[in-house]
């Protein structure tokens, strides 16, 4: 359930797999 949400978030910020960790760190 959370995976799709994070995927959409990453898309919104234009981030990729590498951007995900950065988003979480924020």
UniProtKB/Swiss-Prot annotation:
Its main location: cytoplasm. The keyword Cytoplasm applies. Keywords: Cytoplasm, Electron transport, Redox-active center, Transport. One of its GO terms (cellular component) is cytoplasm. It is found in: Cytoplasm. The keyword Nucleus does not apply. It comes from the Eukaryota. Belongs to the thioredoxin family. Plant H-type subfamily. Participates in various redox reactions through the reversible oxidation of the active center dithiol to a disulfide. The H form is known to activate a number of cytosolic enzymes. This is Thioredoxin H-type. The lineage of its organism: Eukaryota, Viridiplantae, Streptophyta, Embryophyta, Tracheophyta.
